[in-house]
């Protein structure tokens, strides 16, 4: 059998229904994670005593147990758990993006993904050169992933292979940009306004990184989580990337698009090009962010030149 791509993919599966009955049940979690468990990739799964046994059984059924590591760690032992009380206090005072499907505990799990990946980079049980994160509950109910059009089970392994293959494996942190945001929100004085509504910054549910770039960026994201939480804000992890996109500009490889085309566009723009141009490129141009605008243009032009999108598609060049 062909060996998996040289990348360890990481995810986490926790039952939060006991904290909030609007959160998914264990059964719902296991149904949504099923497509991910079928991927022939090195996989590390963090979870609890209520989720890991069933996940292990599914992975064994697919004969992928040998390339899987299960880490059973209860939520109370996670790095972010020390901030749970503060998160609850924050939400009592200021939570304009309130969503009954979430709770303080789900926020804690979500923001711990940075630490999950850093811990895995340090362990590196499969001795891979690269690492990636994928959210657990991306199943579409039809044995596919809802972050991809025309999904097939080889698209994730193909992405990981392309980013890690010799002789030119990536040395960057790869993530998809969702939109343009005003850089004034990097200023701590403007954080309250920033968090008055959900800002579309990046698609945080899937990223791939070389260890050096990833360690720097994920460590900084942990710092921003602490800073933002102590300031009284923070509802989800994607908005933490606003500072990181600038601070580590040359360490980040940006793909562009909406949530439904993350996998399609992760290597090059191929789907929903109207969104990439009108929602991302034009907004960068109108905001006066020239470098960001030119980078989107170059990616779109490359896709045209390589016949990945038709020449008549909306493009700024």
Predicted regions and their residues:
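Short, charged/polar "capping" segments at the starts of alpha-helices
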Residues: 49-56, 184
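Short, acidic, metal-binding catalytic loop of nucleotide-sugar glycosyltransferases
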Residues: 27-42
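N-proximal low-complexity "stem/linker" segments adjacent to membrane-targeting elements
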Residues: 1-28
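GT-A fold catalytic core of metal-dependent nucleotide-sugar glycosyltransferases
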Residues: 111-171
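Short, aromatic/basic amphipathic alpha-helical patches
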Residues: 53-65, 84-86, 245
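Catalytic core and acceptor-binding pocket of nucleotide-sugar-dependent glycosyltransferases
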Residues: 140-144, 165-168, 173-183, 187-287, ...
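Active-site-proximal specificity loops/subdomain of glycosyltransferases
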Residues: 63-124
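Short internal beta-strands
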Residues: 44-48
